[in-house]
Design a protein with these regions (language model features):
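Disordered propeptide/prodomain
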Residues: 2-121, 129-196, 216, 268-270, ...
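Aspartic protease catalytic domain
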Residues: 2-53, 57-59, 113-115, 123-128, ...
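Conserved catalytic motifs of the protein kinase core domain
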Residues: 118, 232, 321
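Solvent-exposed loop/turn segments at secondary-structure junctions
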Residues: 127-130, 137-139, 225-226, 244, ...
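Short beta-strand-centered segments at strand-helix junctions
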Residues: 131-133, 235-242, 246, 335, ...
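Intrinsically disordered, low-complexity regions enriched in proline, serine, glycine
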Residues: 132-133, 141-143, 248, 336, ...
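Extracellular/lumenal carbohydrate-interaction signature centered on repeated Trp-anchored short motifs
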Residues: 193, 247-249, 315-317
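Eukaryotic endomembrane system proteins
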Residues: 196-207, 211-304, 324
Length: 457
């Protein structure tokens, strides 16, 4: 009897151990499946003045480079101001208005179609549609890459007017004779790009993930383009928050990391889309108006001193004017006159007796000094843009000032030209050395101070 009981206990123990082992295996999914990393799509960003840019001129002087940049920033501000107030009235209400041709700051290179055809696009957070020039051309401008021919792509599809992705327009002209969805992009200088809305396969080539395809991306195939750009780029990569934007297609998250824009050999600027976008850092609320990105700027400091500026001058009014836009298409930042007067007065007070004031021929209203930033601004305090949520966007001396000549530099925060301007803009110099990430679904922007090279692995 005792032997039988002992045998029963032994068998029960074996059964328990086998069952426990099976449960442990079942409870550990890592032993039966591989965790899938969130997908991300990465492309290098090429600055207009980079050695990798088709616009690069090794013989250009500092004055040539900065003169273009300042004129471009002024043109871009005019565009943002008009877009922020919805000031454009066009026959085609689907049409966005993109900045004039001089305002190409960053470009991205990826491929369209199957087989893939490389295209170079200007990045723009202030417009929504991704578009490229397409054959056959009624009119096309010069570009560095071959013009995309949709007839040679096995993955190109036009969109019918009834498609949810067809941009809303007036019933009279949203369709062509074949019931395909049309688009029209108008420019500040009166030129335009027009064609069909379609879908196509895009291919990103990344150093860490190889070739990453995106199927059925909505884009504009532009066949009729009147002097839109004076030659190199293929079109525009709109990163605005609309339903047809590539950002929405890839999960409503994207980020860009910008290092030194004045180092022509800096190779680590990059743009990332998708759920695998690096979303880290200090967080501030994001507001969307007229398909521009607005932040809540609460104040400005110079060094440890909070400047006496009324925060109301940075906020958007109930009538839809003013506010603070964050943008990638302007090099400089702009603040309204009352804020600029306080900031420039404080800079002058610190520089008085140390730096020699000079007048810049291109921007006579700018605050400029004789000397070099590295030599003459040793120990000069940086500035901080204080954003809602406790986020401090720090501008060191290379972001607060811009080299404008062989022996001259100017304050890179300026006031808009014209009386009564109430829009503020945070430009790309202020975003140097940050990874700036947008989560459109959560309506948040993340700022992480980082060396962009660290994001490549």
């Amino acid at each position: 009897m005792a032997t039988a009981v002992a045998e029963l206990v032994r068998l029960s123990l074996i059964t328990f151990l086998l069952t426990s082992h099976t449960l442990c295996l079942t409870a550990n999914p890592a032993t039966t499946s591989t965790v899938t990393k969130p997908k991300r799509f990465v492309t290098k960003l090429i600055h207009h003045d980079s050695a990798l840019s088709p616009y690069y001129n090794p013989n250009a002087s500092i004055r040539d480079i900065v003169s273009r940049s300042m004129k471009s920033s002024a043109a871009r501000f005019t565009y943002l101001k008009a877009k922020s107030t919805n000031a454009f009235v066009m026959d085609d209400t689907r049409a966005g208005v993109v900045p004039e041709k001089s305002a190409t700051e960053f470009m991205a290179n990826f491929s369209f179609g199957e087989p893939p055809v490389p295209q170079l696009l200007t990045m723009d957070t202030g417009s929504e549609l991704l578009w490229v020039q397409c054959l056959p051309c009624t009119k096309c401008f010069k570009q560095s890459n071959p013009i995309f021919d949709p007839s040679k792509s096995s993955t190109y599809k036009t969109l019918p007017c009834a498609s949810p992705d067809c941009i809303l327009s007036s019933p009279a002209d949203k369709c062509d004779f074949s019931n395909n969805c049309k688009f029209l992009q108008k420019y500040l200088d009166g030129t335009a790009a027009a064609g069909l809305i379609a879908t196509e396969k895009l291919t990103f080539e990344t150093s860490d993930e190889g070739l990453s395809p995106v199927s059925d991306a909505v884009f504009g195939c532009a066949h009729d383009n009147v002097a839109a750009y004076d030659g190199q780029i293929s079109g525009v990569l709109g990163l605005g928050p609309s339903k047809i934007s590539l950002t929405t297609k890839l999960g409503s998250k994207f980020s860009y990391c910008i290092g030194s824009i004045r180092d022509p050999n800096y190779p680590h600027n990059q743009l990332i889309f998708g759920e695998g976008t690096k979303i880290e850092g200090a967080t501030t609320p994001l507001q969307l108006y007229n398909e521009l990105y607005y932040l809540t700027l609460e104040g400005i400091s110079l060094g440890q001193s909070r400047l006496q500026i009324d925060p109301k001058v940075f906020t958007r009014s109930p009538s839809g004017t003013g506010g603070t836009v964050i943008d990638t298409g302007t090099t400089l930042s702009f603040v309204v006159k009352s804020a600029y007067d306080v900031l420039s007065a404080e800079v002058q007070k610190l520089a008085n007796g140390i730096l020699e004031r000079v007048q810049d021929p291109d921007t006579p209203t700018a605050l400029c000094y004789k000397g070099t930033i590295d030599r003459d601004l040793v120990g000069f305090p940086g500035a901080t843009f204080h954003l809602a949520g406790g986020v401090d966007l720090f501008l060191d001396k290379t972001s607060l000032f811009e080299v404008t000549g062989e022996n001259e530099f100017c304050l890179a925060v300026q006031m808009p030209e014209g009386e009564g301007e109430d829009l503020n803009v945070i430009g790309i110099l202020a975003q140097q050395n940050y990874n700036v990430a947008y989560d459109l679904a959560a309506k948040k922007v993340y700022f992480q101070y980082i060396d962009c090279e660290l994001l490549e692995n």
